[in-house]
Curated annotation (Swiss-Prot):
<keyword id="KW-0448">Lipopolysaccharide biosynthesis</keyword>
<dbReference type="InterPro" id="IPR023882">
    <property type="entry name" value="Colanic_acid_synth_WcaM"/>
</dbReference>
<dbReference type="GO" id="GO:0045228">
    <property type="term" value="P:slime layer polysaccharide biosynthetic process"/>
</dbReference>
<dbReference type="GO" id="GO:0009103">
    <property type="term" value="P:lipopolysaccharide biosynthetic process"/>
</dbReference>
<comment type="pathway">
    <text>Slime biogenesis; slime polysaccharide biosynthesis.</text>
</comment>
<dbReference type="InterPro" id="IPR012334">
    <property type="entry name" value="Pectin_lyas_fold"/>
</dbReference>
<protein>
    <recommendedName>
        <fullName>Colanic acid biosynthesis protein WcaM</fullName>
    </recommendedName>
</protein>
<dbReference type="InterPro" id="IPR011050">
    <property type="entry name" value="Pectin_lyase_fold/virulence"/>
</dbReference>
<dbReference type="InterPro" id="IPR006311">
    <property type="entry name" value="TAT_signal"/>
</dbReference>
């Protein structure tokens, strides 16, 4: 048998064949790259946690198909950055389970897709939660936004969700990190023990929109304190100098329809915000009786530079705009705000409810109250801002309850008198009418000591200045 001859051509041919081998070995790896969509029902049903983790490793989008129920989701599942969970069936747990959303993650509900006792835990930027129905009293919150990492999260979208029979719906704990840009819109909240939306100690956040929501039947019966509010936003410690770094700020709450709760909108230590287009009914003390919260459609505590506009209330407690108080100590007073287009009709209520109760002060400061119409309710003004304007005010309160208009400016002998403006003070009243059920003037004004007083078209007399 002739000996094998190795020519240059033979070596080149062999070398070419060897060069191809790495690419041949790589082909199976390429075949395992994530697919665009995977179906969770193609994975073992007896271990949902492991199945979801593998599904997210295999696909860009994981689908829970219609009619399919994923049970026992009782631990944390991290959705890899940029991936999507599409829920058309149901995902259920015992309250300990959660999906952690990283940068660019989406959870989308379709065809009635739902989560029960499973939390969505937002930990990244550009996250979207949309269209999903959520319920269950297992977790404290259905959607949690926070964590303890000092990071900046941007551009959160929560839209068209339904949360019912739960504790909190959306809970933001903001002390450790920042949310720059959030849109929480077009959603429905009902039958909750806690708040529909709570934005707590969110002192670093900005550009927050909360709008177009329906909130119904929030009633805390579990003994928890400060639970049971529709929408609540809070800064940190009250401070009458209103430093930016301690306030929740730069937000809008708009187009809210609410009923059957103790308090609908609540802000503590806030500034630079707008609340507008709120329609409320049956905001009464019959709800959340032991939660320790005031009864009011809108409650504002220790806030600066805000606008409340176009509020329509029926058979409800109205507004409380009051001091920032901690353990009985008065730390701040509201300043620099405008109320406009406020309507309250309590003719069908058989008992006394708050009308509009305002405490305001400081120098410099202003308060403008315009276009108010209230029936069977009282407008109460306490303490003394530097400049106070009332325009187009019509209030009626029955004599058995009290006056329709109260103006108590004189707090010189009260600890709260520390907030009274005393220099360059102005009181301006135009087209202000306060009557009882018989159309008679109904006012209680303690003292006028403003340096400038302008009065036009009012149905009552002011007391003599000074004293």
């Amino acid at each position: 048998m002739p000996a094998t001859k190795f020519s240059r051509r033979t070596l080149l041919t062999a070398g070419s064949a060897l060069a191809v081998l790495p690419f041949l070995r790589a082909l199976p790896v390429q075949a395992r790259e994530p697919r665009e969509t995977v179906d969770i029902k193609d994975y073992p049903a007896d271990d949902g946690i492991a199945s979801f983790k593998q599904a997210f490793a295999d696909g860009q989008t994981v689908v829970v198909p219609p009619g399919w129920v994923c049970e026992n989701i009782n631990a944390a599942i991290t959705i890899p950055a940029g991936k999507t969970l599409r829920v058309q069936g149901a995902v259920r747990g015992n309250g300990r389970g959660r999906f952690i959303l990283q940068d660019g993650c989406q959870v989308v509900g379709e065809q009635g897709g739902s989560l029960h006792n499973v939390t969505l835990d937002v930990r990244g930027s550009d996250c979207v939660i949309k269209g999903v129905a959520m319920s269950g009293f297992g977790p404290v919150a259905q959607i949690f936004i926070g964590g303890k990492e000092p990071q900046v999260m941007r551009n959160l979208i929560i839209d068209d969700i339904t949360v019912t029979h739960a504790n909190y719906a959306i809970l933001r704990q903001g002390f450790h990190n920042q949310m720059d840009g959030a849109r929480i819109t077009h959603s429905r909240f009902s039958d909750l023990q806690g708040d529909a939306i709570e934005w707590n100690v969110a002192i670093h956040d900005r550009d927050i929109l909360i709008s177009d929501h329906v909130i119904e039947r929030i009633n805390c019966t579990n003994g928890k304190i400060n639970w049971g509010i529709g929408i609540g936003l809070a800064g940190s410690t009250y401070d009458n100098s209103y430093p930016e770094d301690q306030a929740v700020k730069n937000f809008v709450v708009a187009n809210i329809t609410g009923s059957d709760c103790r308090q609908l909108v609540h802000v503590e230590n806030g500034k630079h915000f707008v609340i507008r287009n709120v329609k409320a009914k049956n905001i009464t003390p019959g709800f959340s009786k032991n939660a320790g919260i005031d009864n009011a459609t809108i409650a504002i505590y220790g806030c600066d530079n805000f606008v409340i506009d176009n509020i329509d209330m029926t058979n409800s407690a109205g507004m409380l705009i009051g001091y920032g108080v901690v353990k009985g100590k008065y730390l701040s007073i509201p300043q620099n705000f405008k109320l406009n287009a406020i309507r309250l009709d309590n003719r069908q209520v058989a008992y006394k409810l708050r009308g509009i109760q305002i405490s305001s002060g400081n120098t410099p400061s202003f308060v403008a109250i315009t276009n108010v119409r209230m029936t069977r309710a009282t407008l109460e003004l306490h303490n003394q801002p530097q400049h106070l304007f009332l325009r187009n005010i019509n209030v009626m309160q029955t004599s058995a309850i009290g006056p329709a208009l109260k103006m108590h400016f004189d707090l010189r002998k009260d600890v709260r008198g520390q907030f009274m403006a005393r220099q360059d003070t102005l009181l301006s009243l135009a087209n202000v009418h306060a009557i009882n059920e018989n159309g008679q003037s109904s006012v209680d004004i303690d003292r006028i000591n403003h340096q400038t007083v302008n009065v036009e078209a009012v149905n009552f007399s002011l007391p003599k200045r000074g004293g």
